[in-house]
């Protein structure tokens, strides 16, 4: 089964993503694109790919160990972008801002815990974003990218309270994501700053 660890988005953010996608589809209807289902959009921390069932426990254990170092923190969802560039857009995304550096620290800690458990480490730098569409053909892609980049997507605060391990299953209706395990970050109102907090501030500049 395919497994990944991610952060769930609140309904108000999903609603804004839905509005943005519907606007793009309405204004640029003739572009071949695979649009993300809003209910499936998460902020991915680590994608494992296909794993055996007996490896699930190790993934959950790594996530549990990771969150011990962190209190709940805030990020922002906002801004628009494309990969690789507007003139040859292949992916449309909504940005994720990490003002405290805690998101980068959380992802890095999870990556290290998973590596210690025997899973390959991701070599590419972590660039948090929410994919809303993949463009299948170049025809019309530049026009869609220009429209996407021209729409203002004001920052929306999101409180990160937990890390969730999901499994992904393919069906005739597309991918279905099911939570395997939930891993709560501590409540900062009830506990002192933890090791992840101070470390995240110290090296946030490298994110």
Predicted segments with their positions:
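Histidine-dependent nucleotide/RNA phosphoesterase domain, centered on the 2H-phosphoesterase fold
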Residues: 1-190, 195, 199, 205-207
